[in-house]
């Protein structure tokens, strides 16, 4: 029980050391070669901006996280339901999968302005874009995971007279859990990207808007600060999913061997 936290702390320490090395190298490079701050700001100036405007970055980050979280919940829930239906019916698989492919191939950057035009500048379009971009990865993982149930275990439950709902609950869902957590990791990051893209196309709040305005004003310290804030949010989200996965799937070989 103690090996996992120790391994996690070691991994975190290595990651932080690598980030510190990159920051120190960049600081030395920008200082030694007198790199103009309007091209590449020094890490110290970015850190100072983050400290000075911490309240603003925190406020805008909370808005983006809320939009991404809403889109993640809506998109992954819809994807799981669709994946479950496809796993139970060949007809629905042939019917729904082409629609899912169409959603996957639709450029989000092209759709986002339309959502803003149709639904306004509120939170709804941002959540919709985040949901749209998270849908396909969770759909595929749900479908494959629910279909991955062991054939012998499935036959055994059928001989016991288990209903389809009982088989789904007792066999298919547990078999799909590793796939669902994998899909959640991908979808969380995509939800964040979707929220930022939506904020670029029509918003007055959020980290995406901060990046858009900072880029227009050549305010690179604010731009890099917002990017770092988004990176920190993504890292925290992945860490949360990883912790939940280890807690729920502590019995599974995929967790026990990592």
Language model feature labels by segment:
Residues 117-118, 193-229, 249-258:
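Glycine-rich helix-loop "coupling/hinge" segments at transmembrane-helix boundaries
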Residues 101-137, 144-145:
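Generic hydrophobic transmembrane alpha-helix motif, especially the helices
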Residues 2-4, 32-76:
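Periplasmic/extracellular loop-to-transmembrane helix junction in inner-membrane transport proteins
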Residues 6, 10-32:
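N-terminal signal-anchor transmembrane alpha helix
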Residues 90, 147, 178, 224-258:
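C-terminal transmembrane helix and the adjacent membrane-cytosol boundary/short C-terminal tail
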Residues 138-186, 207, 211:
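Short cytoplasmic-facing helical segments at TM-TM junctions of multi-pass membrane proteins
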Residues 128-132, 164-198, 224-225, 229, ...:
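Transmembrane alpha-helices
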Residues 70-100, 117:
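Transmembrane-helix boundary motif in ABC transporter permease subunits
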């Amino acid at each position: 029980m103690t090996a996992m936290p120790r391994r996690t702390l070691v991994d975190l320490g290595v990651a932080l050391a690598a980030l510190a090395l990159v920051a120190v190298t960049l600081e030395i490079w920008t200082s030694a070669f007198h790199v103009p701050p309007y091209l590449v700001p020094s890490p110290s100036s970015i850190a100072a901006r983050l400290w000075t405007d911490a309240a603003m970055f925190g406020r805008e980050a909370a808005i983006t996280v809320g939009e991404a979280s809403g889109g993640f919940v809506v998109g992954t829930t819809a994807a799981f339901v669709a994946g479950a239906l496809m796993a139970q019916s060949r007809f629905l698989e042939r019917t729904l999968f082409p629609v899912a492919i169409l959603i996957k191939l639709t450029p989000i950057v092209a759709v986002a302005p339309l959502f803003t035009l149709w639904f306004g500048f509120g939170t709804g379009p941002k959540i919709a874009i985040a949901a749209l971009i998270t849908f396909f990865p969770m759909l595929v993982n749900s479908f494959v995971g629910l279909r991955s149930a062991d054939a012998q275990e499935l036959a055994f439950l059928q001989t016991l007279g288990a209903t389809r709902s009982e088989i789904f609950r007792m066999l298919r869902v547990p078999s799909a859990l590793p796939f669902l957590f994998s899909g959640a990791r991908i979808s969380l990051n995509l939800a964040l990207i979707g929220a930022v893209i939506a904020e670029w196309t029509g918003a007055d709040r959020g980290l995406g808007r901060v990046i858009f305005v900072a880029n227009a004003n050549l305010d690179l310290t604010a731009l890099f600060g917002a990017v770092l804030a988004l990176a920190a949010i993504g890292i925290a989200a992945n860490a949360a999913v990883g912790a939940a996965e280890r807690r729920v799937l502590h019995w599974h070989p995929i967790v026990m061997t990592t």
